[in-house]
Amino acid sequence: MEQDNSPRKIQFTVPLLEPHLDPEAAEQIRRRRPTPATLVLTSDQSSPEIDEDRIPNPHLKSTLAMSPRQRKKMTRITPTMKELQMMVEHHLGQQQQGEEPEGAAESTGTQESRPPGIPDTEVESRLGTSGTAKKTAECIPKTHERGSKEPSTKEPSTHIPPLDSKGANSV
């Protein structure tokens, strides 16, 4: 009789590949077969629960159409100042309409980095390429000069003037 504490071996039956393939080609085909984990990922992405019209980011739509290997090669690209400005304008437009989308603060990165009373144009100038606020004394706006007898009557606006082709304010 066999001992009970010996490890049991599980044998799998592997369906034979086409008989006309040589063993090297058969091995390459076997290696290219997806693992169960990638099958779960691809089946989740092709499921009808994901509605492309509900996905706000067009970059994400194109990413869903890619294979897992192509998605793995892609790197995250930080947005340019123009793209950042467009995101902020879009976000402010939605706030004015009263439609605050879920996760909007995380996507633009301006919600938490802007202290009250600072216009959004100054937030953009403070944002670095990583999307985090730079803490420098020169970036803090002065509402009125010390010792000045007249306080500033200009209120901070939420309007962001458009940039000209060189990236400077056209105002």
From Swiss-Prot:
Positions of the UniProt region annotated as Interaction with PPP1R15A: 143-171
Positions carrying N-acetylmethionine: 1
Protein name per the record: Protein phosphatase 1 regulatory subunit 1A
GO MF assignments: protein serine/threonine phosphatase inhibitor activity
GO biological process: glycogen metabolic process; intracellular signal transduction
UniProt biased composition (Basic and acidic residues): 19-29, 135-157
Function field: Inhibitor of protein-phosphatase 1. This protein may be important in hormonal control of glycogen metabolism. Does not inhibit type-2 phosphatases.
Disulfide pairings: none
Subunit structure: Interacts with PPP1R15A.
Family of this protein: Belongs to the protein phosphatase inhibitor 1 family.
Residue segments, region Essential for activity: 9-12, 42-54
Keyword Phosphoprotein: yes
Posttranslational mods: Phosphorylation of Thr-35 is required for activity.
Residues where Phosphothreonine is found: 35
Alphabetized UniProt keyword annotations: Acetylation, Carbohydrate metabolism, Glycogen metabolism, Phosphoprotein, Protein phosphatase inhibitor
